[in-house]
């Protein structure tokens, strides 16, 4: 598959809608003909070599700093849904209030390490101005690293400028606090909007997540080895371009590979074929020594049900087993990414907590071998009251916020609530208890002045 990726780049090539990018690749040794760039085997891989295998992202306080790459795993909420849903309101278009709510829920959760980007599309705001309110929400209501806009170079630059206002221009030049989520226009096309945004973030020494989005049978061949080779080729070209712009800039090699129902054209998630492809891409990205984006709680289900749990669980677990470092879409995803659900969001948060515990591995030491507990309990007794149990019971096992392990009688007395109903109560409780983190008044005023100035400079556009 790695050799086939080189074959794709050499024989088929990649279409790039940007003259500067084509010039950079030509100077680096690519064969450029019009918009088409072709690469000798190994060239793109060599150009990726300056990208760091791991890097830090910095939050507004040190407790929110994270490492991307190496043995670290970063959970990131859903990205891009235009709709939201909850038990009372059903499925509806998202608003800026919903966006702010999900930023707050993310801030409150110890299992979301990153504030995300377009957690949902606030369609009540003009298309050309909503990015300002989204970036402000990340900066104001969270302390965690986040993603900025990539839907135009102007919006990317606005996102970077707002980060500079908050963190300082000199600080931003040496500290990664913001990323751009760059999607390849599969198959094998880098469009002008994405390349412009990629260049903006790379020049600022901020991160990019380069992600081919490939449905087998639509944007790529139907067979998984071909999809893996295509995804690797596309992502490597994006990483290589960032390194030609600014060597050493922090990047994540992302993949979004899944199958589709070949009778209806609908995307499918958690399928064995997609999971096998994820395992393969994980091994190939390790050979490149780059951080990997994969996995997520993905599902085609419209509600929080058994299908949602099964598909989400399979996709997430496989991504983690494949070695994913950056897990976008880790909370809230429903309906193939069209919807972010409040109940699904907190349900996924709970699962991320469980996965985080599993990823810590098995510690073997004197305490966990518990020789004193065996001595105290002896044969034929139980361990409930021994000193070792008393000393370890609070941390011995992961305690779910949502799972019900009471008796049938107690569950009935408590209202016979199912998972979705318990999750509904949980997200409301979390928002009721949210308190915004401290924020400097002068920074807040400067951000608002910047937003007001940008909004006043252009008429509202809804397309």
Question: Can you annotate each of these PLM segments?
Answer:
Residues 23-90:
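Glycine-rich, N-terminal phosphate-binding loop and its surrounding beta-alpha-beta segment
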Residues 1, 13-26, 33-35, 73-76, ...:
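N-terminal glycine-rich anion-binding loops that anchor highly charged ligand groups
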Residues 74-78, 98, 107, 349, ...:
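Short juxta-domain linker segments that transition from a proline/glycine-rich
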Residues 94-321, 325:
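Helix-rich catalytic cores of soluble enzyme domains
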Residues 1-4, 12, 17-24, 343-463:
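Catalytic-core signal marking the mid-to-C-terminal active-site face
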Residues 278, 282-384:
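Hydrophobic alpha-helical bundle architecture
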Residues 26-31, 177, 215, 258-261, ...:
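Short acidic (Asp/Glu) and glycine-rich catalytic loops that position anionic groups and cofactors
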């Amino acid at each position: 598959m790695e050799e086939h990726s080189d074959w794709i780049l050499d024989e088929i090539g990649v279409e790039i809608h940007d003259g500067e990018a084509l010039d950079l690749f030509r100077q680096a040794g690519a064969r450029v003909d019009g918009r088409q760039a072709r690469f000798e085997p190994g060239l793109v891989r060599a150009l990726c070599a300056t990208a760091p295998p791991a890097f830090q992202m910095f939050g507004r306080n040190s407790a929110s700093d994270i490492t991307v790459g190496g043995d670290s795993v970063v959970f990131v909420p859903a990205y891009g849904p235009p709709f939201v849903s909850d038990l009372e309101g059903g499925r509806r278009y998202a608003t800026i209030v919903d966006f702010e709510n999900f930023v707050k829920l993310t801030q409150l959760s110890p299992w979301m390490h990153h504030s995300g980007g377009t957690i949902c599309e606030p369609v009540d705001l003009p298309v050309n101005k909503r990015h300002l309110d989204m970036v402000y929400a990340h900066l104001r209501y969270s302390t965690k690293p986040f993603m900025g806009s990539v839907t135009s170079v102007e919006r990317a630059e606005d996102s970077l400028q707002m980060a500079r206002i908050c963190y300082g221009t000199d600080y931003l030049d040496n500290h990664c606090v913001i990323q751009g989520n760059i999607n390849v226009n599969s198959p094998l096309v880098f469009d002008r909007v994405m390349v412009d945004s990629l260049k903006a973030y790379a020049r600022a020494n901020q991160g990019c997540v380069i992600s081919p989005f490939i449905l087998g049978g639509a944007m790529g061949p139907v067979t998984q080895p071909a999809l893996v080779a295509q995804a690797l080729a596309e992502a490597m070209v994006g990483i290589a371009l960032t390194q030609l712009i600014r060597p050493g800039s922090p990047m994540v090699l992302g993949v979004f590979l899944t199958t589709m129902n070949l009778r209806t054209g609908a995307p499918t998630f958690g399928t064995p074929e997609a999971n096998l492809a994820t395992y393969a891409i994980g091994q190939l990205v390790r050979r490149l020594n780059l951080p990997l984006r994969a996995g997520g709680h993905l599902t085609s289900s419209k509600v929080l049900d058994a299908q949602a749990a099964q598909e989400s669980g399979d996709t997430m677990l496989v991504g983690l087993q494949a070695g994913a470092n950056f897990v976008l879409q880790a909370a809230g995803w429903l309906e193939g990414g069209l919807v972010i659900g409040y109940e699904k969001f907190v349900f996924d948060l709970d699962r991320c907590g469980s996965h985080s515990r599993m990823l810590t591995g098995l510690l073997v030491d004197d305490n966990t071998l518990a020789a004193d507990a065996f001595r105290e309990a002896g044969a034929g007794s139980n361990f409930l009251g021994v000193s070792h149990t008393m000393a370890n019971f609070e941390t011995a096992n992961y305690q779910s916020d949502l799972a019900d392990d009471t008796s049938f009688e107690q569950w009935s007395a408590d209202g016979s609530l199912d998972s979705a109903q318990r999750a509904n109560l949980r997200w409301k409780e979390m928002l009721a208890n949210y308190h915004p983190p401290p924020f400097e008044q002068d920074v807040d005023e400067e951000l608002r002045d910047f937003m007001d100035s940008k909004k006043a400079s252009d008429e509202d556009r809804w397309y």
